[in-house]
């Protein structure tokens, strides 16, 4: 399930949680994303190492011999639906590690152990984090670090649904500017319009709570 910001992906997930009769687990790649989705992190739930996962690992390998409690094993064996939010940030090897774990406790012959998988996110937002040292290993198994290179996912025939209507912004002209920037198609019209809004020397009143965006964490820390 995909769509640009403001199209209702998070709202859909909330409604799904409220109304689905399925036993559902909601995961996300980071702590902040997990809090926003009302779930936990992928690494926490499956107790997966942050080290790269080699997709040719066997089920008996120490790499996937996680010590789960009986309660966790019961949850894994009984879940009907696994939801992964902010899927754009999930690396292909992490998704294959999830697949290996689910196959171990569910059905070894089916991708993700036969569990229904719902991935939610926008590929034009945050990308997966992969260090050069990690990619030097993973590039032997994947064309790209993005989740869609997952070997398990390529064994499935999945459906893609895109939410198109933006509910967060009613100004159609401003929305068209944002979309051009999003698609790397910013032309002179876009740049001129944005530059007209620039106010040199503007000092926001503290009581109005303006948000200041910076390019680096240390700059944000200095401001704060």
What are these regions (language model features)?
Residues 1-224:
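Conserved ATP-binding/catalytic motifs of P-loop helicase motor domains
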């Amino acid at each position: 399930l995909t769509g640009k910001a403001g199209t209702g992906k998070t709202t859909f997930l909330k409604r799904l949680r409220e109304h689905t009769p399925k036993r559902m687990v909601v995961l996300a790649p980071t702590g902040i994303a997990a809090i926003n989705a009302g779930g936990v992190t992928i690494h926490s739930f499956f107790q997966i190492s942050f080290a790269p996962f080699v997709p040719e690992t066997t089920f008996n390998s120490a790499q996937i011999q996680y010590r789960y409690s009986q309660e966790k094993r019961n949850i894994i064996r009984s879940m009907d639906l696994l939801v992964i939010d902010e899927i754009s940030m999930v690396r292909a090897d992490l998704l294959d590690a999830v697949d290996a774990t689910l196959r171990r406790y569910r059905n070894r012959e089916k991708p993700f152990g036969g569990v229904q998988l719902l991935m939610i996110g926008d590929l034009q937002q945050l990308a997966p984090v992969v260090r050069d040292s990690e990619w030097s290993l993973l590039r032997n198994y994947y064309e790209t670090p993005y989740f869609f290179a997952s070997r398990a996912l390529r064994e499935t025939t999945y459906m893609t649904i895109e939410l198109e209507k933006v509910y967060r912004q009613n100004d159609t002209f401003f929305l068209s500017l944002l979309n051009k920037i999003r698609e790397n198609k910013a032309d002179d019209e876009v740049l001129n319009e944005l530059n007209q809004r620039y106010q040199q020397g503007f000092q926001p009143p503290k009581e109005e709570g303006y948000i200041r965006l910076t390019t680096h964490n240390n700059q944000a820390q200095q401001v704060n």
